């Protein structure tokens, strides 16, 4: 920052490329490179020509994400060995002229206990391609195998995705529930977070939940008269915690359960009842031991995403449907609820959809502004709020321009109208920002 910026209270210029490289949100494999898609075509062609090992090798090349360094393979004569990562789990396997087999160890059974075995046996009925088993080393394992003649790229994708996602989800849940019986296995690939980052994330979790609880308990809004407002506040919080903290295990399952519960088609449950359940779940997270939450925070690589790809039109429709609901709350003295609605839209989209990369980057930039203090704590130096607490015009427009340049090759028609952005207050900024995002042209020539 120059002396003139300091004297006049200006926000420093946007300086891309100098920020830390933290990951946020759920991994998606929905948008691959041209090289990945070319590898898929080779895999299909090789399978149709009965060149099964060539097909498997090309399929693994399709799965590989260079940024994640998530898939490795090696061919030795008539065998192909491979491994890939999904969060906390490593999947290993091989293919030869007869079969393809993949396994992932979930946890080690330290002493006989039928409860976790019964749990996984019951889950086998939910699986289409894979199965849980106990291996020779007393490790709870998930297995997929198939004759190579039946190992088409389409089948391999769905089967390996099923086993990888199940393994990644179940290890933390089983270890928490059966900690006296099970122990972690094959977790050396995980990148531990620093104690300071864990402390910061725990603080963010607790302060965010407590802030909403305090607002609802302060009498500013009647939850019986305005259940929709309460729902916006609670769901915005759920999606924000999921995207910014990326928790695993119990916390991730709790956040997903809250989403499922609220949107379950249960005609007899009024919104007020669902809000009470949401609030109870959030209070339970608040009461958890810090060390339990800390164990759910780690860095890992992923290969498969759990969100389905969605077009820009889907996001635009969500914005058009939800954004007008801000009007009543702004006009009737509920600024906190009005501010929560753009956050709800951004969070809902990132939680449920694999939106196009420009949309994802722009929605994350929204979080950079709304949670400026949190990002500063993570080491991001760029300020997106001025000293008066309002969104900062210059760095925001520069950051939007940098996102446009990053995606210009794939989306040459993307031209955000930044002149319509409002910087008067955060609610107006959120409205104008999402309107700008919704009006983008992400069609390709």
Regions found by a protein language model. Give the residues of each.
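Short amphipathic C-terminal alpha-helix that caps PH/PH-like domains
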Residues: 156-170
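Well-ordered alpha/beta subsegment
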Residues: 134-158
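Charged, low-complexity interaction regions
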Residues: 217-226, 242-250, 328-331, 415-419
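N-terminal catalytic cores of peptidoglycan-degrading enzymes
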Residues: 3-105, 109
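Short, internal acidic amphipathic alpha-helical interface segments
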Residues: 103-137
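Charged, long alpha-helical assembly modules
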Residues: 234-337
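Charged, amphipathic alpha-helical linkers/stalks
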Residues: 175-232
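Charge-dense, extended regions
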Residues: 325-445
